[in-house]
Amino acid sequence: MQILQKIKNITLTSLELIHVRLDMARIELVEQKNFLITLLSALFVIFILLLVSFISLLFGLNSLLDPETKQIVFFAISAGAFFLILILLLLMRKILKKQRNFMVDTLTEVKHDIQAIKGALGSPSSKDQE
């Protein structure tokens, strides 16, 4: 009876642990989804506003500038916009690198839990399997 009770306790503990880990994974997935929605919404609004502002700027400059300075000004605007695009792409790359570690901690903890359960059941350790 004692062995049966031990197996029952290990099973219940394992199920509770799995439930907690799945809740943690769900919370991390919700946070990731919210981050992506916010990021994509902000990028869309920024793109539209940038497009409208540049079109207005170009129409205004076209009517104000004399023909000789138009080329210099328009090329400078194009070079400045290209430089800003490069900076924003580098910033986006940096932000996305931070997201690479998404759920790594949770998965590591799940692996530790599995090893602890195997140890409690008396099965061979992971060192023997690797």
From Swiss-Prot:
It holds the Pfam family Phage_holin_3_6. It is found in: Cell membrane. InterPro entries: Phage_holin_3_6. Coiled coil: none annotated. Keywords: Cell membrane, Membrane, Transmembrane, Transmembrane helix. The chain crosses the membrane at residues 35-57, 72-91. This is Uncharacterized protein PM0613. Disulfide bonds: none annotated. It comes from the Bacteria. GO terms for cellular component: plasma membrane. Signal peptide: none annotated. It is a multi-pass membrane protein. Its main location: membrane.
